[in-house]
């Protein structure tokens, strides 16, 4: 996608060494080309304005950048009407996914994770099946409004199923669901091969029933991950040969299910030629027929099952979204916000109540915990973490409550040692809010925040660094800012056995920096004892930064010679 455009490739290579030397023109070219790269072949070749932008190749003007944006909106506006047209004439069947893409079984009962993974560490129990119902109803209503057809089929987020979740889906009108054949294998108690996978099932539970199909994991992954490295015709033929081989001449229903947006960027021309080759071969074949799920179910009998094993398409379990420390912390924060909503929803206006609940539904989306935990990584994990905690903070704000301080701290396990220098000697700074002398903070500890980590509502933390130290009588603190806070408050949190402290002799001053001094005796710190502390910055009743971002800073108050090396 990048090297197809010479200037884009040049900028990409330059970014590896010279990113900070980019000119305004470099950035404009990058903005235009990085968006053009995602245009479909139909528009790259068929739209004159887009062709002209590609032909120019570099030195784009502001007006050309705006033209590219208009073309994006123009093309995107055509997408939903095309789907609606195809669905209305029966050429495609549109299924639904829960509205904000939650893992339904975990909303119904987070403890279900221990069924598919015995001994998995669990958060506090989250049990709100009514939220799962709301996500399913909201999705179906939106699809009906958008396409004029209420979907009867359900692909649960990440293929995640359980008996309780599917009973709710049946109650709200869904007639079939799909998941992975790994779940089928654990349901049947044996490996699900082609014979078991290539037939419809009818699931029944407590008076509800739905048809279900199980995707061929291997064949679906060939399209998703392998065929992009083959010629289009060879890949299409290989795919159909495998289907024929697996079916062995018998009638079969072969479910092929994959993320519809992720694979094609790796194919030549966005996968268009592969799909043409595949569909042509299916259309020309006498032994193959392309069917929607509902058509396949209507034409084939179903094998009955009385239970579905709880799991997802990844490992037939829920380990991606629960069990790791970061995941479980996220679930605990979600639970506390949900409980706060129940307690406070009747104390605010209907509009505020609706806004608070919408923020909860958003925070239930599976993508947050996709990026928490050890399984996946992204250059934007910090931003995802900020957004998740921001949505939870908005729950409290909508309920006219103070968001808890814990929402100011990242859930990510950042490496603090690379950012933290411990004190090396005693200090006695002048509390004037100015850098009076280089030497006044020499010997202090210093904690530096990564520019993009920690701030809940901005792209970088307002705090640049925290310096701290002692003269044996006081705790001295210094905050350096990327930008001076306006209408903000600062809270000092101590990890101490004291229940309540009254500090009467503190001194502080904010000019270019913030400097403060707190008597150790008024902090409840005995001579020679360590002091453990954390700072947080609040604006508009929301925590926007914390130092450190997790845990506590600890400072020894002994004589410097007694300090550990």
Set out the residue ranges of the language-model regions:
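N-terminal catalytic cores of secreted or lumenal carbohydrate-active enzymes
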Residues: 1-116
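Acidic, His- and aromatic-enriched active-site or binding-groove loops in soluble protein domains
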Residues: 114-133, 170-211
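Active-site and substrate-binding clefts of carbohydrate-active enzymes
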Residues: 1-53, 192-425
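Surface-exposed, glycine/proline- and aromatic-rich loop segments on solvent-exposed faces
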Residues: 431, 435-505, 533-545
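The substrate-binding groove and active-site-proximal loops of carbohydrate-active enzymes
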Residues: 1, 57-74, 118-132, 149-157, ...
